[in-house]
């Protein structure tokens, strides 16, 4: 839920001249990106907490079983932080490489839908053809989904989901690094 607004925000900064002021300030550009990361990570956590609240308090009102997070909330928050980082990194990349909101919004939304489909959000990975199952292993959405599954369904701890968390963090680092290199190249001309 964070990729599109973040990428649009970065494009708006370019069109309104804010990014020029950021570049001429004595603060390195990566500090600006870290500030965005922190801000949007808080938004990701708030979104997660709202979804959990719906599962805990609204599900029973609709005759659905209550979402049981007892003893799992800390682990779920850790996954949310890492999944949020991956989404933020992707949003930063799209916002950095886009020149207009008309580019960033549809590309961000479409790419998130495609990554969700590939990652097993729509169709469980085990139901996919074998070649798609192999492709799903490279989707950040699949890493996050598997980490959530492991905690919610298998009562796993952090050590059991460490691989997924590392992949999500490395994805964030890769996206931000590409964004910073692209930004540097664009502004050195």
Region spans (language model):
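Helix-loop-helix units of permease transmembrane domains in multi-pass membrane transporters
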Residues: 9-41
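Junction motif at the cytosolic side of a transmembrane helix
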Residues: 10-11, 93, 97, 167-189
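Transmembrane helix-loop junction
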Residues: 12, 56, 60, 95-96, ...
């Amino acid at each position: 839920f964070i990729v599109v607004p973040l990428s649009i925000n970065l494009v708006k900064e370019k069109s309104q001249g804010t990014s020029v002021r950021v570049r001429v300030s004595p603060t390195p550009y990566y500090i600006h990106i870290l500030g965005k990361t922190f801000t949007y990570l808080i938004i990701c956590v708030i979104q997660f907490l709202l979804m959990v609240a719906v599962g805990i308090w609204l599900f029973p009102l609709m005759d659905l079983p209550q979402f049981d997070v007892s003893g799992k909330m800390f682990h779920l928050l850790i996954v949310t932080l890492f999944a949020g980082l991956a989404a933020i990194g992707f949003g930063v990349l799209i916002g950095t490489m886009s020149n207009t909101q008309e580019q960033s919004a549809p590309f961000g939304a479409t790419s998130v839908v495609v990554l969700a489909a590939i990652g097993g959000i729509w169709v469980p990975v085990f139901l996919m053809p074998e070649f798609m199952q192999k492709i799903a292993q490279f989707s950040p959405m699949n890493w996050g989904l598997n980490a959530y599954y492991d905690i919610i369904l298998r009562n796993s701890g952090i050590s059991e989901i460490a691989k997924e968390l590392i992949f999500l963090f490395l994805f964030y680092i890769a996206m931000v690094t590409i964004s910073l290199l692209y930004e540097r190249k664009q502004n050195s001309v």
